[in-house]
C-alpha cells in the first residue's frame, strides 16, 4: 500500500465521544524518545504565559507533570510556596521525585486528572493549577478542567497550554512528514484524544464553567543544526519505537515499512540546513 493512501484505506471517526471511552490511552507512551522531549521543557520555554502571574509563596498543582522539569522550575520561583506534581505513571513520578530531591518545597504523587484527591489540596485550594500538553490527550478535557477548577481556590488561576498539530508548520515539506501528521492524528483520535487541542482550549474552558478566560498562543521553533537534529531524531525514534508505533501498527493504520519511511524522512529533514519547524501552542488562563 502506498503511504499516501493510508487515509483512504483506513477510516476512523473524526472524534470518539468521551462516553465511549472509560480510559484514554496515552498516544506517546513513556519511551525514552518521549521523555527526552519532556525533560527539555522548562518554565521559560513552556510556561512563559503564566510566569508574570506567579508570586513567591503561592501554592501550585502541576497536572501531568511527567519527569518534573517544569514542576521543579516553578517550585524554585514560588518558594516557599508548596508545589505538587501529579502524573498517572508511577515510573515517571519516581523519576520526578529523584530529580526534585534537592528541592524542599516540591513533591510528586501518582494522580488522576479526573479525580485529584491524591493532590491533597490546601484547605482553601491551590493558588494555581497548571497543565502542560495534557488536555489534548484526554477523552474528556472539559471534565478535567472542572476538576482542576474544583481544587483551585476562588479567584485563583487554572492554566493550560497545548499544541495544535494541524497548525504546525515546517519546511521543506517532504511527503514523509505529511504522512507523519496524518498518521499521528489518526492514532491520537483512535485514543479518544484531540491532537489539535490548542485551538479548542478556550471552548473547553467555557464549557467547564469558566467565564473569565484569557487566550494566547506561542511557538516552539526548531531551526539551528542542534535543534533540528534533536527534534528530528526524537520523532524518528518515536515513530519506530514508542507506544505510538505500536498503536499505529496494531490498529492497522500503518506497517513497519511505512513507519521506517517516515523515520527516514524525519532524519533527512533534520539534515537539511534550510529546514525549519514551528509548533503552535494554544494557551489559556482561567480565573476560578
Language model features with spans:
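Class I SAM-dependent methyltransferase Rossmann-like catalytic core
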Residues: 22-42
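Conserved alpha-helix/loop element of class I SAM-dependent methyltransferases that forms part
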Residues: 40-56, 73
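Class I SAM-dependent methyltransferase SAM/SAH-binding core
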Residues: 61-63, 67-116
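A short acidic, Gly/Pro-enriched loop at the edge of an enzyme's catalytic core
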Residues: 115-129
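A short SAM/SAH-binding and catalytic strip from SAM-dependent methyltransferases
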Residues: 127-140
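A short glycine-rich, Lys/Arg-flanked "PGG" loop and its adjoining helix->strand segment in the class I
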Residues: 142-157
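Conserved catalytic/acceptor-binding region of the Class I
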Residues: 159-229
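Conserved Class I S-adenosyl-L-methionine
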Residues: 212-288
Amino acid at each position: 500500500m502506498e503511504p499516501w493512501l493510508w487515509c483512504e484505506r483506513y477510516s476512523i471517526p473524526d472524534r470518539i465521544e468521551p462516553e465511549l471511552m472509560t480510559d484514554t490511552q496515552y498516544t506517546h507512551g513513556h519511551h525514552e524518545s518521549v521523555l527526552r522531549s519532556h525533560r527539555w521543557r522548562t518554565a521559560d520555554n513552556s510556561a512563559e504565559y503564566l510566569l508574570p502571574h506567579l508570586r513567591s509563596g503561592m501554592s501550585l498543582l502541576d497536572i501531568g507533570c511527567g519527569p518534573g522539569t517544569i514542576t521543579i522550575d516553578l517550585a524554585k520561583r514560588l518558594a516557599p510556596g508548596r508545589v505538587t506534581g501529579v502524573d498517572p505513571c508511577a515510573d515517571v513520578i519516581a523519576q520526578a521525585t529523584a530529580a526534585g530531591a534537592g528541592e524542599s518545597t516540591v513533591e510528586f504523587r501518582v494522580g488522576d486528572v479526573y479525580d485529584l484527591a491524591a493532590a491533597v489540596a490546601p484547605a482553601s485550594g491551590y493558588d494555581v493549577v497548571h497543565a502542560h500538553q495534557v488536555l489534548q490527550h484526554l477523552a474528556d478535557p472539559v471534565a478535567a478542567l472542572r476538576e482542576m477548577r474544583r481544587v483551585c481556590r476562588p479567584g485563583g488561576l487554572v492554566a493550560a497550554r497545548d499544541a495544535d498539530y494541524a497548525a504546525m508548520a515546517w519546511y521543506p515539506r517532504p511527503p514523509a512528514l505529511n504522512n507523519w501528521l496524518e498518521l499521528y492524528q489518526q492514532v491520537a483520535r483512535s485514543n479518544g484524544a484531540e491532537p489539535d487541542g490548542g485551538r479548542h482550549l478556550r471552548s473547553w474552558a467555557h464549557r467547564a464553567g469558566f467565564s473569565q478566560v484569557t487566550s494566547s498562543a506561542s511557538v516552539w521553533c526548531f531551526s539551528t543544526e542542534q535543534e533540528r537534529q534533536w527534534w528530528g531524531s526524537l520523532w524518528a525514534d518515536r515513530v519506530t519505537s514508542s507506544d505510538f508505533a505500536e498503536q499505529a501498527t496494531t490498529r492497522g493504520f500503518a506497517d513497519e515499512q511505512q513507519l521506517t519511511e517516515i523515520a527516514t524522512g524525519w532524519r533527512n529533514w533534520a539534515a537539511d540546513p534550510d529546514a525549519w519547524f514551528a509548533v503552535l501552542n494554544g494557551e489559556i488562563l482561567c480565573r476560578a
